[in-house]
A protein has these predicted regions:
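Short, basic/aromatic recognition patches
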Residues: 18-26
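Boundary at the C-terminal end of the N-terminal hydrophobic targeting segment
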Residues: 14-16
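Active-site helix/loop module of the DD-peptidase/beta-lactamase fold
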Residues: 69, 79-82, 97-137, 168-206
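A short, well-structured edge-of-sheet supersecondary motif
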Residues: 27-71
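Solvent-exposed loop and edge beta-strand segments that line ligand/cofactor-binding
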Residues: 144-153, 200-206
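N-terminal signal peptide c-region/cleavage motif recognized by signal peptidases
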Residues: 9-11
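Active-site-proximal alpha-helical segments within enzyme catalytic domains
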Residues: 157-164, 204-206
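Active-site SXXK
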Residues: 42, 61-70, 76-103, 161-166
Length: 206
C-alpha cells in the first residue's frame, strides 16, 4: 500500500498510449497511491494525484487520517511522516554552518530543562545524540541508557530538535524552513502544520 508521495527517477519515455496510462492509473488507485511522478533530468514527464480510499488493512487505518489532509489547488496535501526528520537534520546542519549551534553541545544549553533526568545527566545529551537516536532516553523522556551507548528510534525525543532550531534562530519552524530550505528548493507547497495530540511523537507535521 502506498500512502506517501513517491518520486520516480526514470529514463522511460512519456506515456503516449492513453490505454496504458489508464491501466497504470487504475493500478495505482487500487493500491492507494496518492501521488505519482516520473522525472528525468529534472523534467517532469508525468504527474498525477489520486484520492486515497479507506480500503486499507486495519494496521494502516491510523495512517489514513494522519496522511490525508484534503487537496490544495487539486494537489493532495499530506503529512510526510518521518521524512520530516530528514528536513530537520538538514536544517540543523544549516544552523551549525551559520554558527548558531554546535551539535556536540548539550541540548539543554539551547532549550533549557527538557527531560525527567537530573540536570547532571541531562547535560550529557547532545544535539548529535538526538540526530543519531542515541539520547539514552525512552519515549517518556526517562533514563534508559548512557547517551551515545544505545540506539533507539525515538520520535518524541528527536522532535526536540525543532525547538532547538526555533530557539537558536529566533524564527518559527515554518519561516525558518522556508528561508533556509524550501524556497531554495522551490518547494512552494511544503509547510509545517500542528498535529492532533502530537501524533507519532512529532508535535508538527510537514
Amino acid at each position: 500500500i502506498f500512502l506517501l508521495t513517491f518520486i520516480f527517477i526514470s529514463s522511460l519515455p512519456v506515456f503516449s498510449d492513453n490505454s496504458a496510462k489508464s491501466e497504470l492509473f487504475e493500478y495505482l488507485i487500487q493500491n492507494n497511491t496518492s501521488s505519482f511522478l516520473v522525472s528525468e533530468k529534472g523534467e517532469i514527464l508525468l504527474e498525477e494525484e489520486f484520492e486515497v480510499q479507506k480500503k486499507l488493512k486495519p494496521q494502516s487505518l491510523m495512517f489514513f487520517n494522519l496522511l490525508r489532509h484534503g487537496f490544495i489547488e487539486n494537489r493532495s496535501q499530506e503529512d510526510v511522516a518521518s521524512i520530516q526528520k530528514s528536513f530537520v537534520s538538514i536544517l540543523i546542519g544549516i544552523a551549525q554552518q551559520k554558527g548558531l549551534l554546535d551539535i556536540n553541545k548539550s541540548v539543554t544549553s539551547y532549550i533549557g530543562k527538557w527531560t525527567l533526568l537530573t540536570q547532571e545527566k541531562e547535560n550529557l545529551i547532545t544535539i548529535r545524540n538526538l540526530l543519531t537516536m542515541t539520547s539514552g532516553l525512552d519515549a517518556d523522556f526517562k533514563y534508559d541508557a548512557q547517551p551515545g551507548s544505545k540506539w533507539l528510534y525515538n520520535s518524541r525525543v528527536y522532535s526536540q530538535l525543532i525547538y532547538v532550531l526555533e530557539k537558536t534562530s529566533g524564527l518559527q519552524i515554518n519561516e525558518l524552513s522556508s528561508q533556509w530550505l524550501f524556497n531554495e528548493l522551490e518547494m512552494k507547497e511544503t509547510f509545517w502544520k500542528e498535529r492532533k495530540k502530537g501524533f507519532g511523537g512529532f508535535p508538527k507535521d510537514s
